[in-house]
Amino acid sequence: TQGVSSAASDVYKRQVMDKLKECFEKKQPVDELIHEKMMELFRLYLIVGGMPAVVDAYIRTNNLKEVLRIQQGIVQLYYKDIAKYDKDNKLYLDEIFSLIPSELNNKNKRFIMKDLNENFRFSRYENSFIWLKEAGVALPVYCVQEPEIPLLLSKSTNLFKLFLSDVGLLASMYVDGLQLKILNREKDINFGAIYENAAAQELKAHGFELYYFNSKKQGELDFVIEYKGNVLPLEIKSGKAYTRHNALDNVLKDERYAIPQALVFCNENISTVDKIVYLPIYMIGFLENEKIDEYIYSIDLSALQ
């Protein structure tokens, strides 16, 4: 009977996910009960993350203290791996990795180089940033000067936000007790960094290059991605003021960019206002980058012979 109930449970979960995908595609509100349950699951995901050993521990015990213990052990393993890196850069790696949580807690979340060293030279640290990215430890999100396709053309290599590759590890590096605060939705913590970290992971996992936009005149957009031939601005809102987004409004009004749509991921159900679609944060995983099919094309050059 357990096999039958387990199979029935799997079918139900698939049905729920199919229904959520349908709501995402049609931009229709989710059943309120399902929405609340999905938000609960999302908050749990912010704590547990996706590291296999951590997920396994949670499934076995449901004990968040055990989850935290394993996460902190993984963080220590990262430090040991860093120690094996060549001695010239080990210190830089240590510093950068240690600073990620506090840098993300800053208002604009950008990695401030001067926090590493008052006499900072990007060229001196560049290999360390590359190592953290290539090792799958960190996710850089680069600033672009213009929200125009191709985004790569206006990318700044030395202006970026640096997220961790696992949101659960990020949560574990903050103060003790944060896990309960997340579950209880307490107001005195900065959920913005954790929400944005989860968003960066999902976007990267679905094949998107990670960028954000910032200008003194218009303000900052949390993420900009290339989607279906256009630039798609994404705002990640962890609080109640999810309809307040001055930078997004400025960019959408700018006729130079001709951006057709923007998405705001928040705690609320689906709604649409003009060009902006408000979506529950747990739906960010439904954004998928287009896969290019094989396209074979050849030119007959025989006439040139």
Give the predicted meaning of each segment:
Residues N230-L232, Q261:
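Structural motif
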Residues E268-Q305:
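Domain-level recognition of nuclease-like catalytic cores that cleave nucleotide substrates
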Residues M51, D56-K228:
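Accessory nucleic acid-recognition modules appended to NTPase machines
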Residues Y212, P233-I236:
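Short catalytic-loop micro-motif centered on adjacent basic/acidic residues
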Residues K21-I74:
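Amphipathic alpha-helical "lid/sensor" segments that cap RecA-like P-loop NTPase cores
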Residues D10-E36, I296-L304:
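Charged, glycine/proline-rich intrinsically disordered loops and linkers
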